[in-house]
Each structure stands twice: as structure tokens, then as C-alpha cells.
């Protein structure tokens, strides 16, 4: 392989990254940038472009998570709680390191409360409280749980049931 291949791959991926559209628009270019940066990282993990690619990949994934949250909030505002739950859970599954995780968990609590699903809302409350204890979302969720008179002693959870690092994508399908 030629020594310039990682650079060429980086330029190709970056050209898609630079044209990343607003979250309201189609995300084909963002998806393509994710694919190209991922391929570069996998093929040339020790190249100097891999580190830059990882940084861009984090930014892209956060952007895509933002889009999912925006769509989910729209569904939620229209009363389509199951559709919004599906979107919020996809953020938890697909964008684990996104800055949108705490808000997605909070919105899941809201949706489950709206559907009258107390156990699910409480479980996500505990996940939020465990993983993001000192955030505005944790404070808001505690208020939401109390305002809806959800019994805070409903169930004791083990650490592995709450830690987002331990939970697998399919675990969210069970909740």
C-alpha cells in the first residue's frame, strides 16, 4: 500500500464531513462521512489521520444523535409516545457517547409517564440518576417522578442494571 492512502481516505471522508447538513435535512452526507472515517480508522488505526478521524466521528455521531432527538421530540409533542420512545432508545443504542444521552433518558421518562408505564419511567429515572447524577436532567427527572407521585422505593436495582457501560443495546428492547 502507498503511504498516502490514509491521507487520501481522510480527504475523502472530510469532504463529506464538511458538507454535513443541518439536522433538519437528509443526512446521507453525514452517514457517508461516518462510513468513510470508520473505514480509515479500521484500516489504518496507527496513522496520524486516525486520531483526527476519531474526533470527526464523535462530532458526526453527536450530530446524528441530535437529529434523532429532534425527531423524537416532535413525535412526543404530537402525542406519538411509542414512536418517540423508539427514537430516544435508538440514541441510547447507536450513540452511546453522545451528549444527548441524558436528555434522551429524561424524555423516555416523560413518555413512559404519559403512557402510564410507571415501572419503565422509574427504571429510566434510576439509570439517569446513576449515570448522570449532577445534571439538570437528573434534577428535572427527580422532580417529574415526585410530581407524578411515583413510589421511589418501587424496586432496588443492581449496579449492572443501571450502568450504561454494562447495558447492551438489546437490553433497551426489554424495558
How would you name each of these model-derived features?
Residues 1-175:
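Acidic, polar-rich low-complexity tracts and alpha-helical solenoid repeat scaffolds
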